[in-house]
């Protein structure tokens, strides 16, 4: 059987249409796993439909609220490739739905939900049979009836909500819960399960998702800073230190903290990778002296870099790609919603098996000459620099700020972002976040009167800090955010980037430049609408874009 998935930037693009629709997607996801993820999403939409109904009766089931976004997160690009676990999530969704339905019926014997997903049952235990059932829920199944524009808007909402669900899970792990957010999530997820076809309603929904995600990023920021302190500028070594070692990748700071606690006194050093790099800026994490540095570059290079790492690797969230290529599948471990067939999974927060494996391996035999980069420009630090930025602008020492961030990826056109960074004039500042920074974060950019020209604000969700800084600067200068000497040049890859974009658009931020390509699910008509409403456009050349942005 074949699949249909168009959710990430590397999706197949042909004159006949966009999307991975063969036996395997560009990410390595098989048609089986992709189709079963469609089935899981349908089950989650049915669960959300009953969660909405339950709230009408004052019933709030926290097991449902914690499970639903987490399971949805498992369908995000490069998270879970393990078909049996995807089916397990679908079964759990249905079991939770039936329990919630029973709670509703206990209050009102006539309780009903008008949603096509509300009574979904799995037809078999056989993966092949379930894959055939999943064909009913392929996202493009009614494309001929609704047209590409409606399908594109549905997917914009679905993928945006998926990105928000990921951030909800990150926040939930840190003890953050906001009933209004979960109520809104369930309402939108249930509505998408009705296969809506009204263009205006879908556009409004996309903006609602963006506004909701701003609140999600707020509680995630509160969770991270509340537990681990406010990030402050910190130098991080990106070269090896002699000793046994563990590499931890992803976004989950709690997993990193637990690993650091459990490796104290063991002689095992811990390295961050990918989006875990900003962890070094948090006081409660950098206090561990055996958190010795950051290893590697963008996630897309992991098959080479992980193969060379002389210790075990822990994946706490996206992005994982096929570990058998580099033959390190026997020493990579998955956590939480991450999965790869045949790879060992850690069900709880006990890392003793990983530590034991690290102690049996050689580790780095010698220390390399250190290469230090600076991270840790969190929200509090950025706000503390607001007056300095305004002073530099008023004295014409600082001409422009470029927010140059987002996802990294394998496409060659992404070298645009390296070229852009190196061509930013000396009187301009680069604010960066997310893993796109690996395109230029080891280069030297100097400073403007002591203020670094390259300012690393953190993970992708730390777009919240950048937004708060922009709002603060606008308030202090008595202008709108769009009137600031600030331009956003964003690289995208997956659904977290989509919801960040929706968040910015929902807040009224205009004239964003994105690349390296437009999302495959957005038609030329939809791109034209977004350009007309928000000034959103794709990158062209570094020279042309730089000239246009500096003259705006």
From Swiss-Prot:
GO terms under biological process: response to hydrogen peroxide
Binding of [2Fe-2S] cluster, residues: 5, 8, 20, 27
Domain of life, source organism: Bacteria
Record key words, sorted: 2Fe-2S, Cytoplasm, Iron, Iron-sulfur, Metal-binding, Oxidoreductase
Chemical reaction(s) catalysed: A + NH4(+) + H2O = hydroxylamine + AH2 + H(+)
InterPro entries per UniProt: HCP/CODH (IPR004137), Hydroxylam_reduct (IPR010048), Prismane-like_a/b-sand (IPR016099), Prismane-like_sf (IPR011254), Prismane_a-bundle (IPR016100)
Cofactor: [2Fe-2S] cluster; hybrid [4Fe-2O-2S] cluster
Gene Ontology molecular-function annotations: 2 iron, 2 sulfur cluster binding; hydroxylamine reductase activity; metal ion binding; peroxidase activity
Pfam families the record matches: Prismane
Top class in the EC scheme: oxidoreductase
Subcellular location: Cytoplasm
Cofactor notes: Binds 1 [2Fe-2S] cluster.
Binding site residues for hybrid [4Fe-2O-2S] cluster: 251, 275, 319, 407, 435, 460, 494, 496
GO annotation, cellular component aspect: cytoplasm
Positions carrying Cysteine persulfide: 407
Enzyme Commission number(s): 1.7.99.1
Protein family per UniProt: Belongs to the HCP family.
PANTHER family xref list: HYDROXYLAMINE REDUCTASE
Role of this protein: Catalyzes the reduction of hydroxylamine to form NH(3) and H(2)O.
HAMAP family cross-referenced by the UniProt entry: Hydroxylam_reduct
Protein name per its UniProtKB record: Hydroxylamine reductase
UniProt gene name: hcp
């Amino acid at each position: 059987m074949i699949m249909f998935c168009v959710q990430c930037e590397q999706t197949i693009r042909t004159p006949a249409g966009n999307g991975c629709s063969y036996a395997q997607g560009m990410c390595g996801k098989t048609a089986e796993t992709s189709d079963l993820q469609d089935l899981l999403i349908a089950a989650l939409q049915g669960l959300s439909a009953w969660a909405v109904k339950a709230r009408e009766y004052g019933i709030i089931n926290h097991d449902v609220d914690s499970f639903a976004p987490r399971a949805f997160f498992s369908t995000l690009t490069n998270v879970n490739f393990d078909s049996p676990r995807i089916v397990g999530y679908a079964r759990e969704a249905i079991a939770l739905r039936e329990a919630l339905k029973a709670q509703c019926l206990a209050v009102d014997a006539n309780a009903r939900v008008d949603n096509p997903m509300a009574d979904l049952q799995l037809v078999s235990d056989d993966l092949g049979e379930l894959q055939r059932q999943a064909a009913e829920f392929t996202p493009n199944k009614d494309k001929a009836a609704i047209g590409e524009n409606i399908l594109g808007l549905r997917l914009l909402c679905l993928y945006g909500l998926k990105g928000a669900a990921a951030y909800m899970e990150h926040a939930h792990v840190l003890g953050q819960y906001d009933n209004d957010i979960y109520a809104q999530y369930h309402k939108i997820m249930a509505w998408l399960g009705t296969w809506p076809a009204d263009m205006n309603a879908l556009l409004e929904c996309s903006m609602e998702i963006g506004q909701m995600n701003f609140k999600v990023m707020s509680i995630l920021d509160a969770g991270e800073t509340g537990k681990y302190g406010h990030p402050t500028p910190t130098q991080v070594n990106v070269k090896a230190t002699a000793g046994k070692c563990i590499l931890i990748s992803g976004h989950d700071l709690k997993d990193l903290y637990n690993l650091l606690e459990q490796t104290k006194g063991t002689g095992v050093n811990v390295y961050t990778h990918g989006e875990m790099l900003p962890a070094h800026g948090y006081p409660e994490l950098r206090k561990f002296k055996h958190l010795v540095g950051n290893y590697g570059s963008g996630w897309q290079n992991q098959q080479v870099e992980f193969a060379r790492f002389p210790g075990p690797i822990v994946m706490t969230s996206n992005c994982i790609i096929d570990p058998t290529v580099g033959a390190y599948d026997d020493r990579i471990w998955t956590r939480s919603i991450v999965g790869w067939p045949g790879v060992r999974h850690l069900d709880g927060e006990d890392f003793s098996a990983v530590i034991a494996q690290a102690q049996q391996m050689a580790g780095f035999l010698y220390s390399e000459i250190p290469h230090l980069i600076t991270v840790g420009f969190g929200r509090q630090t950025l706000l503390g620099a607001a007056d300095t930025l305004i002073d530099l602008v008023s004295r014409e020492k600082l001409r422009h700020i470029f927010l140059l961030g987002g996802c990294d990826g394998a496409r060659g056109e992404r070298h645009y972002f390296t070229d852009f960074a190196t061509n930013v004039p000396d009187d301009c500042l680069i604010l960066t976040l997310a893993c796109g920074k690996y395109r230029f974060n080891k280069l030297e950019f100097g400073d403007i009167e002591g203020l670094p020209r390259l300012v690393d604000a953190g993970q992708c969700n730390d777009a919240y800090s950048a937004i708060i800084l922009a709002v603060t600067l606008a308030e202090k200068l008595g202008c709108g955010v769009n009137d600031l000497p600030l331009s956003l040049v964003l690289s995208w890859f997956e659904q977290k980037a989509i919801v960040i974009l929706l968040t910015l658009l929902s807040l009224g931020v205009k004239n964003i430049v994105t690349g390296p390509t437009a999302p495959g699910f957005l038609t030329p008509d939809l791109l034209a609408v977004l350009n007309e409403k928000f000034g959103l456009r794709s990158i062209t050349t570094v020279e042309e874009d730089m000239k246009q942005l500096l003259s705006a």
